[in-house]
């Protein structure tokens, strides 16, 4: 299960597993963003291709408005997923 909550500095903290069963929940959050956000992945254990698709759609929508998503505290496994998919070229990963 995926939990998305706002942190103390207005970043979004993701916890759990971001898979196909959580896409509708996440889509509602990410596609409602009107400005760039930092996504804290420190509690994220897994992301599927469906999760990547939601993030890509949000990034595309935000970039058309001059904003972007920034990812922080990305574990090695998820960092590899972004690298192998080429998403490390699309997202700023700190």
Where are these regions (language model features)?
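Short acidic-hydrophobic, aromatic-tinged amphipathic segments that line or gate anion-handling sites
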Residues: 92-94
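Amphipathic alpha-helical interaction surfaces in cytosolic regulatory modules
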Residues: 20-90
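Short beta-strand/loop segment at the start of cytosolic alpha/beta domains
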Residues: 1-13
């Amino acid at each position: 299960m995926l939990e998305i909550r706002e942190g103390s500095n207005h970043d979004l903290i993701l916890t759990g597993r971001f898979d196909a069963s959580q896409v509708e929940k996440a889509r509602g959050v990410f596609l409602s963003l009107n400005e760039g956000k930092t996504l804290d992945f420190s509690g994220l254990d897994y992301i599927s291709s469906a999760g990547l698709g939601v993030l890509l759609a949000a990034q595309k929508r935000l970039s058309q408005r001059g904003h972007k998503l920034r990812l922080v505290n990305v574990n090695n496994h998820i960092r590899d997923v972004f690298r192998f998919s080429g998403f490390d070229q699309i997202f700023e990963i700190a």
